Amino acid sequence: MRVRKFKIKIQSQDQFRDDVIKTWKMTEKGKPLEGDYDLILSFPDLSWLSKILSPERLRIIQTIRDKKPESIYQLAKFLGRAPANVQKDVHDLAEYKIIELKKTRKKGQKRESLHPEYNWDGFDIAV
């Protein structure tokens, strides 16, 4: 079974531009992403990274991975946090593809709920 990993990089705009060009050329040649990662996220400095992966958001990722909540509401209950705050954090993490949100509907339910999933085996941070 293939390991699914993503990489987070801290780099300047110039380094980012150079990486985009390099990645584009590698992709055109059919070569895999750097280090065979499925996703590479880049941030200009540590302050950006600390906003995206704050301690609370890391706790969300860990709870999704370990407890596999069926909805954002259930995740909020596991965390002991307000559902609205958890929902914002979950949507931000999903925007960066760190977690996935799947629409699900239980038998007998009228409306769909969003089921958060963490489908990575791990991630690396390069500073």
Regions found by a protein language model. Name each.
Residues M1-G30:
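General nucleic-acid-binding
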Residues P55-K68:
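Short amphipathic alpha-helical interface segments
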Residues P32-L58:
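Short alpha-helical segments that sit at the start of domains
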Residues A84-N85:
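Key DNA-contact positions within bacterial/archaeal DNA-binding proteins
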Residues D89:
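Residues within the DNA-recognition helix of helix-turn-helix
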Residues K97-T104:
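A short, conserved structural fragment
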Residues S47-E56, S71, T104-V127:
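Short, cationic-aromatic polyanion-contact patches
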Residues Q74-G80, L93:
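A short acidic, leucine-rich amphipathic alpha-helix
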